[in-house]
Amino acid sequence: MITRCYLEITNVCNLNCVFCPKTTRPKHTMTMEQFDTLTTRLMGEVKFLYFHLMGEPFLHPLLPQFVLMAREKGFVPVITTNGTLMTQRADMLEALPHKLQISLHSHEGNGKVNLGQYIDEVMTFAKEAA
C-alpha cells in the first residue's frame, strides 16, 4: 500500500509566491465526478490523501464535500493551505480533515498581507475548529 497520494484538486491560487514555479497550464478545478472516479480507483491502494500541489485547496468550492467523500471511502484526508482563506470558509468547520497544514512561508514569499493579520486569521480558524 502506498502511504500517501498528493491530489491537485485545483491549480488556481490566490497568491503569486516567488518560490512557486510559474506555469502556462490552463486553470483547472477538479469536478466531483473526477474526484469520485479518482478516489474510487485509489481505494485500498493509498492511506493518506493530501489536498495540495500547485493550487490553493480552499479556493475549491467542493473542498468540504471532497474531504467528506475521502473519509467515507476510508482515506485519511490532509490539507495543505497558504492559510489566507480559512476564515472565509466556515463550511470547512463541518468537514475538517485529519490534519490541516498551514504553509506560513507563503507569507514570506508573497508579502501582500501583514504578518500579524496573517497569523490572526490562522489562529481564528484554529480556535473555531477546536
Listing of model-derived features with the role each one plays in the protein:
Residues 1-100, 109-113, 117:
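Conserved alpha-helical substructure of the radical SAM core
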Residues 102-130:
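Classical nucleotidyltransferase
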